[in-house]
Amino acid sequence: MAEFLPPPECPVFEPSWEEFADPFAFIHKIRPIAEQTGICKVRPPPDWQPPFACDVDKLHFTPRIQRLNELEAQTRVKLNFLDQIAKFWELQGCTLKIPHVERKILDLFQLNRLVAEEGGFDVVCKERKWTKIATRMGFAPGKAVGSHIRAHYERILYPYNLFQSGASLLCLQKPDLTSDTKDKEYKPHDIPQRQSVQPSESCPPARRAKRLRAEATNIKTESDSPEVRTHNLRRRMGCAPPKCENEKETYSAVKLAEKREHAGEQERDKAKARSKKPTSAVDLYVCLLCGSGNDEDRLLLCDGCDDSYHTFCLIPPLHDVPKGDWRCPQCLAQECNKPQEAFGFEQAARDYTLRTFGEMADAFKSDYFNMPVHMVPTELVEKEFWRLVSTIEEDVTVEYGADIASKEFGSGFPVRDGKFKVRPEEEEYLDSGWNLNNMPVMEQSVLAHITADICGMKLPWLYVGMCFSSFCWHIEDHWSYSINYLHWGEPKTWYGAPGYAAEQLEDVMKKLAPELFESQPDLLHQLVTIMNPNTLMAHGVPVYRTNQCAGEFVITFPRAYHSGFNQGFNFAEAVNFCTVDWLPLGRQCIEHYRLLSRYCVFSHDEMICKMASKADILDVVVASTVQKDMAIMIDDEKMLREKVQKLGVTDSERVAFELFPDDERQCYKCKTTCFMSAVYCPCKPGLLVCLYHVEDLCSCPTYQYKLGYRYTLEELYPMMNALKMRAESYNEWASNVNEALEAKISNKRSLISFKALIEESELKKFPDNDLLRHLRLVTQDADKCASVAQQLLNGKRQTRYRSGGGKCPNQLTVNELRLFVRQLYALPCVLSQTPLLKDLLDRVEAFQQQSQKLLSEEMPSAAELQELLDVSFDFDVDLPQLAELRVRLEQARWLEDVQMASAEQNSLTLDDMRRLIDSGVGLAPYPAVEKAMAKLQELLTVSEHWDDKARNLIKARPRQSLSSLVVAVKEIEEIPAYLPSGAALKDAVQKAQDWLQEVEALQVGGRVPVLDTLVELVTRGRSIPVHLDYLPRLESLVAEVQAWKECAANTFLCENSPYSLLEVLCPRCDIGTLGLKRKQKKLKEPMPSGKKRSTKLESLSDLERALSESKDTASAMATLGEARLKEMEALRSLRAANEGKVLCSEEDAELKVCVCQKEPAAPMIQCELCRGFFHTGCVSVPHALQGPRVWLCPQCRRSEKPPLEKILPLLASLQRIRVRLPEGDALRYMIERTVNWQHRAQQMLYSGNLKLLQDKVGSGLLYNRWQSTAGPLPETNKVSQTIGAMSFSMPHDWDNRTIYLHSPFSTGQQCIPLHVVSTELDELMMEAQLLQVSLPEIQELYQILFTKQSPSLQAEQKPSVGPSNEKSECCRGKKDGMSYMERKLKRRFERESFCDEKRARVRKMRTPKKKKLKLSHTKDVSSSSRMERERERLLEAQRSSESHLVPSDTSFSEQEDSEDEDAICPAVTCLQPEGEEVDWVQCDGSCNQWFHQVCVGISPEMAEKEDYICASCAGKGSPYRK
């Protein structure tokens, strides 16, 4: 089967609220469009949502059962045919099984039709057309299908066709219909047996099993009662087992057979029982063909009539006794020739409520499509529906709750006095015309004149649908309109054909399914047959479709066939209505019903007469239409009564037919409801006929008939005349209208009287004819004239000057005003505004005369023009002079604007010129305006040229020189206008000149420029769009400074350091805080008076500001020196406070230590600088295997502390740059501070106090307060904090110091309490830790102070200072060979030329002065080469010290040149040798000091061959470098 193609959509209307207010007016409006499609859909306004008024719990109904494939006309014909074939073979004891051909069920109906079309079985066989028939049936050619089809036809269909043709079947051998095991058993539908009268026990709407079965089953169909059940109605599908003789005899004795009487004289539909056979045993066993009773075992007994036949007497003879029921040839013909009964729906056995039906419907749909009901597409349901109705292989049964009376269960719309209580906001739906309870009885509906409550027509019917439940092709009763509203639920799919195609649709269905119409001529009126819209469209029938959703109306028009089905569970309500235009169609429908013998729902003539009896209140149009229809009715009635009278019916009487029930006054022949007249005979009381069928009443003579009439003809004419009078009642009104329209000036009526005539027409509902339309038009014109006149009298001009000077669309010209006044006088009615407008016209004409006089002058003044314009404001009339007056006024004002704009020098901008030119262009030509325009245009051209040129000069790349820009500025200054780009260019030139002056002033001063000044100049110079010669040099200088700062930061700053370079180089300003974001609590010990903790940001910013503001280096050094003093003082106070925490009692709850600011808890570690205590779990501590080291806390560890040789190149490069910056001053001060410290440290080393201090340390005097030994420091997973030069390796006995065990300040490592030994040494070591430079003197001091071993042991322990030696080795850098050799030769020469006197020898030794690590470096020697030589000497000193076992506890630092005459050996353990021959050796490291050879253990040979590096220079590397 081809896929279903949806027909085109019908029109969909969406009325506005105004259109929706009157349903009949709206339907009348859309009728020309919707009639062309038969159906249409109406979507109410969105806010129109009536409440659902049905009682869901109380509404119950019994639905109809619908088997889908029995609804379609062509499918039902096939099923009826197959049922006849099955019945034919069943009566002969065989079961029909439909064969398969090419794995497809053979369509027996199509095969039978095609063979008949080709001429019958004999012709097809003779002409060999079986292959052609197979091809027409869709089988592929060339597979010998034709022979198979012939065999099946000959076996199954040929005997049936012979029987239908009347041939005797006695000679036919019964074929073996059950031999083919592949055939499918056919299950008859028993369609005629399923009537709506007797509902079955249970028939749920579920998908049934396929009709075609592989195995035979015994299926029985129960008849009405067991007493009248017969074998021929049982239609058993399988062969029953043979019955025993006793059972057959008993059954045959009581069996009855139905026999239909065909004689014309007997009454219809009266069945008679077949007369019973004699019960003689001889008669029961006698063959009717041979008359013999012999061979009883071969004697067949008919299951229908109990006649007996020998098997061998039948032609051809039967070899065996049939196993199933067997009918003789007479019974077979009797059963098969019974007329087919009409098809109808049967009622379901179950009663449903809305809830139970909905549950069943949703379950069916979801199970069928295997998805939720709301997810099934409507297109899928539509295609599946038309597939199911067209197949005979699948039975799908559904139920439909149709035609449920709303009178019994209540309408879905709210009604007055109903059980449903509406809310106040819902009361509008009670009286709405779209409420289906109101529409049929509205005044515009002719059904309102029918008093009876006709269900479905005047009273709505309710419809509860489920998926696939359908309504078949039909037209409404009496060809009326219908309207259907879907209250809720899933959509309803509609199909409709227009009314003009109704007969065409009927002809197509009769053509395609003639068998159905033979038994039911009015089949399409039974609502039991559908046909695929595609089939109808293929035969030329126009069909349209739509999906009606919840809240939408569907309207069908007169005689428009429509059908459809439901997409799922829903609830709809429908009713009929008839408009005036339906009346002619209604009479035509009655004639059509008479031909079909169809019952009428109401009497059309009765309705016409009732309307005629109310002629005085009928609408004029309705009265006119009813009068025309009544005229036809009277003519027909007059003709029919004359005909009856000619037939001999003379007796008559008046009968009130409207008092009889409709079924008691129906014509016996055509079923028409009689009202005007009827004929009846005394022989058949209660039986009557209409005047069309008098001859069909009975066989009595016609003079015995009696004519019953409702009205005499004399009574009918006055009724018609009343309608006519009603239709003509507005003649008087029309006369009044004509008189008013044609009245003279003196007799004219007022506008109010005209409106009264219109109101009268509306009140009496006069037809909308030309006269009424003309009256409305005249009245509307007069009303408009009155409104305009009042506006002209009351209104003034809305604006003083209208743009463009054009006419306002609503304004009248003077001529129009003059014509309008004339029109007012010409109106059929009188207006009160007419004389007032005449006065207005006079004043306007006076204004025109004055304007013309003023405009004729050569140059009117602006004041006069304005005064005249002010007068015109009182006239709401378009005056032609106003435009010219405004033009003159605009010209005068424009010239004034030009003069004001040019009054001041350089006040005229480009925008002003453009604005004036733009406004002047719109002015009318005038000499003064044109001259001013020319000047402005010339000035604008020049100004734009120079403005663009100035803009280009500013944006030029590369930038223009200052001299060229100065020339351009001079040119621009000569233009009498303000140029934005010119002003910008002038400003740029001025800025460039100022900038150059500042740069030149900076050069002239001779001072070293400050970095901030340079950065500010560079920033300003980049923003000036002028080529500046000095700018690249300044940018290069700033870039060098930035590069220097980055190099310095890489040298000093630790990785991810929180400190800036300036913070590291300057003296500390944050001493006393832990650098935390939150403010810490003060310790109990008071700070020194006048000292206050300050935040790092404030102090650093103050110091940086002071450095930036300093005029020269000297003032900067002074500032930094002051900061150093504050640093030292603050650190001393902090150390004292931290040391004092040890003496605090354990009960002191406010005592907080460490970065976590919590109470002390062992183990702890103490910072060497600030003497603060820290939990070993809060900070990174050295690993136990690394030995004791000097440890600094995170606050005191600020930089990498590079060695001095790394810092000196930075200072040298800074001097080359010659730019002052705070970081440079800080670096100079740090180096100067370092050198000063070195000098103090050397003095301490050279003095004899160190020996005494070393003895004190060795005797343990410093640790007499420690009482016990602490365990080793617990290991931690944190990385050991080796803080540059601060992580010194301590002697091996450092861990053997005693510490206070029971104190919470028990530490793994504590600081050296030097303040107990020497305040000077404590100050020196404290400042050593503050220095951000690695110095060998620091390590030397620690080694001297804390080494207790003898010199021999010290020499043995020298390798323990491996890191220092290794670092010293690494400190050897590149070395200038020539300078090194020159120094060696010079030293040898000096040693040979020593004089005997020590002083002279020492002076000669010091004559070649060595380089000093001071700020006053000589310029002839570069710092970089000096550092390379010092690095090489360090390496040589290291090798020398390793070979000679130089003691590691001795360290020397470089000393400044002294003018002292006495030479001093810097060795700490100087032996002070006496004599003239004392040998000296000079250190080849960085210090260049002279030592006694005997004091340092060097022989003369070694001094000649090897380089000597003192212990101080050899120790600069490892401990101090990271």
Swiss-Prot record:
Residues 428-594 form the JmjC domain. Residues 1400-1416 have a biased composition (Basic residues). Keywords: Biological rhythms, Chromatin regulator, Dioxygenase, Iron, Metal-binding, Nucleus, Oxidoreductase, Repeat, Repressor, Transcription, Transcription regulation, Zinc, Zinc-finger. It is found in: Nucleus. It is an enzyme of class 1 (oxidoreductase). Residues 1353-1365 have a biased composition (Polar residues). Residues 10-51 form the JmjN domain. Residues 75-165 form the ARID domain. It catalyses: N(6),N(6),N(6)-trimethyl-L-lysyl(4)-[histone H3] + 3 2-oxoglutarate + 3 O2 = L-lysyl(4)-[histone H3] + 3 formaldehyde + 3 succinate + 3 CO2. This is Lysine-specific demethylase 5B. The lineage of its organism: Eukaryota, Metazoa, Chordata, Craniata, Vertebrata.
